Amino acid sequence: MMRKFLIFLGFVFGFTGLALAGGHLENEKTPEKFLQYYFDAFNAQDAKKLDTVFAKPFQRIRNGETISYTSWREYINFEVVKKTGWKRSVINETEIVYDSDKTAVVRILFSRLDASDNIVAKAEAAMIIVKPGSQWKLATILLPESIPVSEEDS
């Protein structure tokens, strides 16, 4: 009887752990769900979730120049982003240009909004995402110069 109770508790705690993982499982679904997971993590400035988003190394292409980063922390500087009046970003449109089991190329239109939900910037970007294991990762982003993210942009 005690053994059955312990097995039951194991299942309860196991499923509770999965439920608490929440959006983490979004990394394992479609490219679109992964991108929403990334935007949610970015908007929340959630370092733990952002750690799960980026491939290592990660590359950015801007104005014909390719820059490699060993961590998203080298790439994203939220103080630079906030100087534009940014409060959050929203996805306006996505188009899957290429999709396979382990790689996708996505064209995305997005907006940066201020605290009153006014658009402070709007841009088109291209992202290459890869799935080296069970989770999608952002491997490369092509982002216009008009969207500051890093120290290099300020």
Language model features with spans:
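Short solvent-exposed beta->alpha transition segments
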Residues: 32, 51-88
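A mature extracytoplasmic/lumenal domain signature
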Residues: 54, 64-65, 108-112, 125-127, ...
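Surface-exposed, charged secondary-structure patches
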Residues: 74-118
